[in-house]
Amino acid sequence: MLLVLDLGISSLVLVVSLVLPLIGLFVRHKWRVAAQRREEIRRLLIHASEEAARAELEASVEFSSVAVSNVFHCPVCYCLATTRCSRCKAVRYCSGKCQIIHWRQGHKDECHPASIVYDSEDESDSDLRLGEENGQNTPEETLLVGPEPVTIPIGESLLSNRARSPEDGNGDIADNKDDLIDKEEAVSVAETSGSSFSGFSSSPRNDSGDEISRCESFSSSESERSESLLDAHVSVEPEDTCFSTIEDAPSKLLSPKFVHLVESVDNLANLPKLSVHKPEDDAGQNQSQSRSLHSLVTDRHPVSADPSLKSSDFWGTALGSAERVSDSCVKSKSGRPGNSSLHFSFGSGSSRDTSAAKVSEQRSSILKEAPRGTGYISDGVNLRERNAKRFDEAEIALPISSSTDALSPLDSSNLSHVTLPKSKSASSENGSMLAPLKVGEVQLLASKASNTKKCADLMKHSPLGAKSVRVLDHQKQNGAVVQHINSLHGRSGLKASVLKVVDQWTRPKSENEMAGRHGHKGLFPYEVFAKLYTYKIEFQPCGLINVGNSCFANVVFQCLMFTPPLTTYFLQQFHSRACTKKEQCFTCGFEKLVVKAKEEKSPLSPNGLLSQLQNIGIFLGNGKEEDAHEFLRFVVDTMQSVCIKASEYDMTKSSKLEDTTLIGLTFGGYLRSKIKCMKCQVKSELREKMMDLTVEIDGDISTLDDALRRFTRTEILDGENKYRCGSCKSYERAKKKLKITEPPNVLTIALKRFQAGKFGKLNKLIRFPETLDLAPYVSGGSEKSHDYKLYGVIVHLDVMNAAFSGHYVCYIRNQNKWYKADDSTVVTSDVERILTKGAYMLFYARCTPTPPRLAVCTKTEASNKKSRVPLPKANEKSTISRSVSTSSPELSSNTPGGGRSGNIQSFYSSFQRLQKILEEDSASDSSSLFDSNSDECSCSTDSTSMDDFADFIFGDHQGRAHGQSETPSPTSSSSSSSPPFTRRSPLSRSSPETYGTSRHQLPLGGER
């Protein structure tokens, strides 16, 4: 019998045949994965190198040297320009095609005929300069009013291009031929343009030293070309001094303006008299001449002979109250009472000999029959802007006669200025819309009279530092008494500046002024802001279509739509109603998006806003992966610049106005940085503007509170980060500490999930609360409530843990309901799930809005006036700022010495209150009243002891309170001018502590 022996070879073969293929498949899979990883790393390295090269190229372009000034480039294609705009002469092109493209892009809204530009490079409260005061021969000015032109002497230096670029600053560039063409076309356009304006032509003349004068011509915007509305003759009359001192001259020059005379709803009840005044200095005395423009009215606008005809309250609309002054208070030199006149006064700071040049000897016969004794300003003379920027500041003298009211006459030396807020208000009566009034200062001119008394209760300082006063209400004018205090008198300029501080601290801010600030588009009243902030509105988010890597913009737009004050503001369409450039305005485009999102439920396309990205930032463009945090900063900065431009104020001299815009009240806050040198123990302190916070989350940080504690803890500056000490003149080790001094109403926190030189993303979970208490990180935070509520979260979804690629989604809250917005998809969500997300940006809204400290600092409570406060110690030193208050309060008294004790008590009460506010920064060892680096007020180097205060208050303040006038000295004159503010845009001086890192540190990019 055969025996079969099984050696197990078949089983071994079976096992080997099965295991070896499996091993081969596994090795092959591993090899493929490794190859894919190597390819991905190679791709990432190539991408990173391209990004670095592009960043270096952009940085080199950004910091390249300025081009030669005599080379002009086309604004469209940046080629060498060979021609220029035939109308404004300001923009140069390489061809007519580029000119047409630029015209359609928006130049048609900015192009204005060449006109006079008044240079004001060195402005102060005591000096005015017209153009370039070089004393050369002056040409003549042709005023196109009526059928025949009238020639008036004018300074040659005043003829310059308004919109000339900085490269055109040298006078050697423009040739004589271009200048001749400019002047000829200015006259031709004045004769043929659809909106008529003043044209000027120049011709040589001899050295006569005649005064530099300016006139404005008015024409109706609704008149037919064949019908003349206005006929005028110009004459020169000697007049009394327009300004008693050089300090009374206006502090800002006028911009040239093409204004129009609109048809009156009252059929021109009374026609004012237009005159031009100019102060001159001759042998220590002020002399002036007035150039009067006696206007005639055609049959289309008959002059009513009824003096009792009431106007439509033009000034009441612009200012909130109607103003009426008696003719007995303001008399002309000729002694003719009852002449109602409207004076346009232009001051010149140059001193030269003057001679009266008779321009026209004939006067209008209709003017003699014009009614006299009218006490109101007719609405027939309304200023409507047309095709140009409006007046920066215009001075209008309003001596208006009245046969019913009798006031004491004004002394000619006591000229008072009334500051009118530049508003854009318009009201309608009888179907007529009032045009925006662009007036900077209104001057109550007074002529010499036998009896001199003080007529009205005035105040001296406006919110912008100009010498101005506010006219009392019509009900208070009959028995009012003027207290004209010469702030430049005294034995020293220091006491004069202290007097100004006393005047400002002892007078409360009226509610009318706060309400009047709403007339400024860029000065947003806090009361209105608080109402918008706390207003509840039901608003469900609407999806936004991704138009090509636009998820970074969609999440920012969604969060801004639900920012508390902006939601109501844009839904009410407040901005678009006042904006003049709706097509090119980014804020108007965003407002349209918010309104459509409220009305429609289907997803919207943000393509209209994204097309303007090149106007927002140099690094942003369509189809590119961008960082949401960087884009948010650009959007906020753009909206802030729109508010600032709309306010039409020079922010370098009024930098505090940045905090009073809608965006400033919403996102604006302040950080304080303290650095102490460890070698010399010298401390330095810097206060910076803050629009958001960027906090580090690396290391052992796991919560938002940990990140904020690291942000505000003391840091040692050593190694490459050594501090350059100004005392040691070398780099030394130092201690640095950051603190939030003024937290914003809307706090935006960016978690720094990227690092310089690394491509990976910090994909760790950072827990954040729904309600944030910011008090531990705020200087003096225990005295106020700093509770914030979460309303928006932006999350970055990365691809392979990369920081420069991925996708953005956001979570937003409205009426305690949370929504998730993923481009065009919007679904509901819950807060528990949101708090566990890897957030990149957090949006917190303050539970109770708080005004800026600047407004709190300048407010004076009525109870503080009645309380007695002990005087400070005599040995205490303090620095007094020359321009502390931003309000324009009143200093009134019915008796010559009345209210003196209350003023002193209120002064020291305000002194201690301000000192207490500044002492909230308890870590500061500075003993001065105002820190030199503080943005609370302007800087000053004057220091005085309380002995000087006592000498000032009990010495010559009594004479000032009685309104005694003295001759101002040059020293006191120079000490009254406020030092100019120099400040850049908040985002232009960003620091890593304030705004996070720059684009070169690879922020998070977003894409599908």
UniProtKB/Swiss-Prot annotation:
GO terms for cellular component: membrane. Zn(2+) 1 binds at residues 74, 77, 94, 98. Changing residue 551 to S: Abolishes deubiquitination activity. The keyword Zinc-finger applies. Residues 193-203, 340-351, 878-888, 965-992 have a biased composition (Low complexity). Disulfide bonds: none annotated. Zn(2+) 2 binds at residues 85, 88, 107, 111. It catalyses: Thiol-dependent hydrolysis of ester, thioester, amide, peptide and isopeptide bonds formed by the C-terminal Gly of ubiquitin (a 76-residue protein attached to proteins as an intracellular targeting signal). Its main location: membrane. The keyword Zinc-finger applies. InterPro entries: Papain-like_cys_pep_sf (IPR038765), Peptidase_C19 (IPR050164), Peptidase_C19_UCH (IPR001394), USP_CS (IPR018200), USP_dom (IPR028889), Znf_MYND (IPR002893). A zinc finger (MYND-type) spans 74-111. Keywords: Hydrolase, Membrane, Metal-binding, Protease, Thiol protease, Transmembrane, Transmembrane helix, Ubl conjugation pathway, Zinc, Zinc-finger. Belongs to the peptidase C19 family. This is Ubiquitin carboxyl-terminal hydrolase 16. It comes from Arabidopsis thaliana.
